[in-house]
Regions:
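Coiled-coil dimerization/phosphotransfer module
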Residues: 1-177
Length: 177
């Protein structure tokens, strides 16, 4: 947007155009720094080094709403499954914080042996809050982003969110995604 304004002014007011280009450059630097911070948050070192069971408590602790966490994983799923799972949890906790007006969140990560999904089964994530409910997939991009991310690994997402009754988000990810 700023560069477009600069292009319009370049012939009429080169000094103003230069100021706009400098502004755009600063905005680009700021966006890159924000992207680095987001990327670090989406795939932190603890996830890479120690796995989902170690990374989930870190994500839960960062959430301003108190989180009760249960991790029932006998071993590490695939790295891809862990990355998708961590993203799903972070996005779900962000949605709770922004929209749910919840006082608590329950987060369960568990392995489900499901022969129909291969011998390894599924990684199931369940995020339950006691908030206001009424989550609408048609509003915002958060839930769409989750569906897209899960769809890319043949996973699934269900959201149960009756108005006034909180929200239950359940994600299934192939263990060896």
């Amino acid at each position: 947007m700023t560069l477009t304004r600069a292009r319009v002014r370049i012939s009429k007011d080169p000094e103003q155009a230069l100021a706009l280009i400098t502004e755009a450059q600063n905005e680009a630097k700021q966006v890159m720094e924000e992207l680095r911070q987001v990327a670090k948050g989406l795939h932190p070192r603890v996830l890479t080094d120690h796995g989902l069971a170690s990374a989930l408590p870190v994500a839960a602790e960062r959430c301003p709403v108190p989180v009760r966490l249960q991790v029932l994983l006998p071993e590490r799923p695939s790295k891809r499954a862990e990355g998708v799972a961590y993203y799903v949890v972070c996005e779900a906790l962000t949605n709770v914080t922004k929209h749910a007006r919840a006082t608590r969140v329950d987060l369960v990560a568990e392995h489900l042996p499901q022969p129909e999904h291969g011998t390894e089964g599924l990684l199931q994530l369940t995020v339950t809050d006691d908030g206001c409910g009424g989550a609408d997939p048609e509003v915002g991009t958060g839930l769409y982003g989750l569906w897209d991310r899960l769809d890319a690994v043949d996973g699934s997402l269900t959201v149960h969110s009756p108005p006034g009754k909180g929200t239950v988000l359940t994600a299934h990810i192939p263990w060896k995604a």
